[in-house]
Swiss-Prot record:
Keyword Repeat annotated: no
Homology family: Belongs to the ZipA family.
Protein name, UniProt field: Cell division protein ZipA
Cellular compartments per GO CC: cell division site; plasma membrane
Periplasmic membrane side: 1-6
Membrane topology: Single-pass type I membrane protein
Protein keywords: Cell cycle, Cell division, Cell inner membrane, Cell membrane, Membrane, Transmembrane, Transmembrane helix
Lineage: superkingdom: Bacteria
InterPro entries per UniProt: Cell_div_ZipA, ZipA_FtsZ-bd_C, ZipA_FtsZ-bd_C_sf
Physiological role: Essential cell division protein that stabilizes the FtsZ protofilaments by cross-linking them and that serves as a cytoplasmic membrane anchor for the Z ring. Also required for the recruitment to the septal ring of downstream cell division proteins.
C-alpha cells in the first residue's frame, strides 16, 4: 500500500512539472521577437557595417543607386530674377498707335416736372467708343481714336434726345390728366345726384297715448310668516331686464338693454312704494307689485304676456306666490278677465 502511494506521488509531481514547463514554453513562443533576434535585423546590420567603409557609387549626374545626390547649399539672399517677356513688335506698334481717349462731357438737363416711377425712361448715358469696345471684348484690329469734336456732337445729340423724351412725357401726362378730369367730374355729379335722391328722414313725434283708462296689476307676495329680502330681489330684477328709473322704481322697456318706451313697472307693495338700490341688502318687504297701464306702447297682449311670465319667474326664484289685483290667487278665470280688459282698451 505504501509503494502504491509513493508511485502516485511521483507521477503527480512529474505531471505538475510537465504542465509548468509547457506553460512557460507557450508564453515564450507567443512573445514577439526583438529586432536583434530577427533574421532581417542581422541583415540590415551587416549591410550598414558593410556600407560605412565602402565608397558610394554615383552616376554621371551625381546620384547614387538609391537616387540620392549630394547636399547643395543655396544662399538665402539669392533673388529671383524674372525672365524678360518676349519682344512683340506688333504689340509695340499697336500701343504707339492707340491714342488716349477723351472723356465726353456729361450733360444732365434739369427735369421740368417730377417723373413717375412707373414709366421707364430710356438710358441715354454716353460711353466712349473705347469703353464700349472694352465692354464687348478685345478686338484684334486697331481702334480709331476718339476726337473731341465727335464727343461734342454726341453730347448735343444726347441733349436733343433727352429734351424730346421729356416733351413726349409731358404731353402724355397732360392727356392723362384730361382723361381723368371728366371721370372725376362724373363721379362728383353721381354723388350729388345720389344725395339729392335720398329722401330726408323726418322724425315724427310719438303718438300720445293720453290718459290711462285701465291698469293691470299682479302681486308677488311672500308666503305666510316670511319676508322678501332686497338682496334677493335686486339680482332677480336685473336678470328679468328691469332698469331702475323714474319714480324710484324698476321699469321694463322695449329694449332689453333699458332703452325705449316703458312697457310695465315694478313697485314696492308697502308704502311709500319705491326702492333704494344702494340699501337693498337692508331692505325687506311683504311683496312687490307689477302694473301695466292701458293703452300701452306696442302690442298690449304681448306686453301682458311678458309681465305675467316675469311675475311667475320672480315667484319661483324667491319662493313667493302670484296674486291678482285683488290679492286673490292667480287662476284661469282671472287670466280671461285680464285678456277681456286688454281687448276692451285696444
Amino acid at each position: 500500500m505504501e509503494d502504491l502511494q509513493l508511485v502516485l506521488f511521483v507521477l503527480g509531481a512529474i505531471a505538475i512539472v510537465a504542465v509548468l514547463v509547457h506553460g512557460f514554453w507557450s508564453i515564450r513562443r507567443q512573445q514577439p521577437k526583438s529586432l536583434k533576434d530577427s533574421p532581417m535585423g542581422n541583415f540590415y546590420k551587416k549591410q550598414a557595417e558593410r556600407g560605412e567603409g565602402a565608397p558610394k557609387r554615383v552616376d554621371a549626374d551625381g546620384f547614387d543607386a538609391d537616387g540620392i545626390g549630394a547636399v547643395r547649399v543655396r544662399k538665402a539672399n539669392e533673388a529671383h530674377t524674372p525672365e524678360a517677356p518676349a519682344f512683340n513688335p506688333y504689340l509695340k506698334q499697336e500701343a504707339k498707335a492707340q491714342p488716349q481717349p477723351v472723356e465726353p462731357v456729361q450733360v444732365e438737363p434739369k427735369p421740368l416736372f417730377k417723373q413717375e416711377p412707373s414709366m421707364a425712361q430710356p438710358d441715354f448715358s454716353l460711353q466712349s467708343p473705347t469703353a464700349k469696345e472694352q465692354h464687348r471684348g478685345p478686338k484684334a484690329s486697331r481702334q480709331e481714336p476718339v476726337l473731341p469734336g465727335h464727343s461734342a456732337n454726341l453730347a448735343q445729340a444726347h441733349v436733343g434726345q433727352s429734351h424730346a423724351a421729356m416733351v413726349a412725357q409731358k404731353a402724355a401726362e397732360e392727356q392723362r390728366a384730361q382723361v381723368q378730369m371728366p371721370t372725376q367730374t362724373a363721379l362728383f355729379d353721381e354723388e350729388e345726384a345720389y344725395e339729392e335722391e335720398q329722401p330726408q328722414v323726418v322724425e315724427q313725434p310719438d303718438d300720445d297715448l293720453g290718459e290711462p283708462r285701465d291698469v293691470l296689476v299682479l302681486h308677488v307676495v311672500a308666503k305666510e310668516g316670511q319676508q322678501l329680502n332686497g338682496a334677493e330681489l335686486l339680482p332677480c330684477f336685473l336678470t328679468l331686464n328691469f332698469k331702475y328709473g323714474d319714480m324710484n322704481i324698476f321699469h321694463r322697456h322695449v329694449d332689453n338693454a333699458g332703452n325705449g318706451k316703458v312697457l310695465f313697472s315694478i313697485a314696492n307693495m308697502v308704502k311709500p312704494g319705491f326702492f333704494d338700490p344702494d340699501n337693498m341688502e337692508q331692505f325687506s318687504t311683504q311683496g312687490v307689485v307689477f302694473f301695466m297701464t292701458l293703452p300701452c306702447y306696442g302690442d298690449a297682449l304681448m306686453n301682458f304676456s311678458i309681465m305675467l311670465n316675469s311675475a311667475r319667474q320672480l315667484a319661483d326664484d324667491i319662493d313667493a306666490v302670484v296674486l291678482d289685483g285683488q290679492r286673490q290667487p292667480w287662476g284661469e278665470f282671472t287670466k280671461q278677465d285680464y285678456l277681456h280688459r286688454i281687448r276692451a282698451n285696444a
